[in-house]
């Protein structure tokens, strides 16, 4: 049996407690990321609504004091979750097969508003691997979500 890290992609149908159904796509593969981004673009292009995406980032664990660490040893993105409507891409980026330029282009696209909570740390961590979010909308910074 292959380890879960070696698994390139899987798609799941998930029903929330509210009865809403979601499609969750888990991957570390750039081909799956590209296909999911194309799906998002088709969704955007078939709608007159603003292009809005939910964004969350999980990091690798750092056990030592950050002050003592070299840049290469600091926290890095482990998983990036990107959601449009009822489709969520869970990109295990720390185990990505190759760098996905399409993903870099997507998250820096100024047409897309990326909704986040407490984006300050996410911005720093994403920047460590050259990812820049073009139009973040931080719910906490705009006081739409409490900081406590």
Ranges and model annotations:
Residues 87-104, 108:
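Nucleic-acid-processing active sites and adjacent nucleic-acid-binding tracks
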Residues 63-87:
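A short alpha/beta connector and helix-capping loop motif
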Residues 55-57, 91-94, 115-119:
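Short His-Asn-centered micro-motif
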Residues 61-62, 99-100, 122-124:
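Short, well-ordered alpha-helical microsegments
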Residues 52, 88, 113:
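Hydrophobic "anchor" residues on beta-strands that sit immediately upstream
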Residues 81-85, 106, 112, 119-148:
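Metal-dependent phosphoesterase core characteristic of DEDDh/y 3'-5' exonuclease domains
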Residues 1-53, 57, 61, 96, ...:
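N-terminal accessory regions of nucleic-acid-interacting proteins
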Residues 17-28, 82-92, 140:
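Short, basic, glycine/proline-bearing loop/turn elements
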């Amino acid at each position: 049996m292959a380890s879960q890290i070696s698994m390139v992609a899987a798609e799941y149908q998930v029903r929330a407690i509210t009865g809403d159904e979601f499609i969750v796509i888990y991957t570390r593969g750039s081909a799956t990321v590209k296909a999911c981004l194309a799906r998002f673009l088709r969704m955007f292009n078939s709608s007159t609504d603003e292009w809005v995406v939910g964004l969350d980032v999980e990091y690798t664990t750092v056990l030592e004091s950050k002050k003592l660490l070299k840049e290469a040893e600091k926290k890095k993105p482990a998983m990036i979750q990107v959601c449009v409507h009822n489709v969520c891409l869970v990109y295990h980026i720390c185990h990505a097969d190759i760098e996905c330029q399409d993903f870099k282009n997507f998250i820096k696209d100024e047409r897309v508003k990326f909704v986040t909570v407490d984006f300050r740390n996410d911005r720093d961590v994403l920047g460590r691997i050259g990812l820049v979010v073009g139009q973040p909308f931080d719910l906490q910074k705009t006081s739409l979500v409490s900081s406590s």
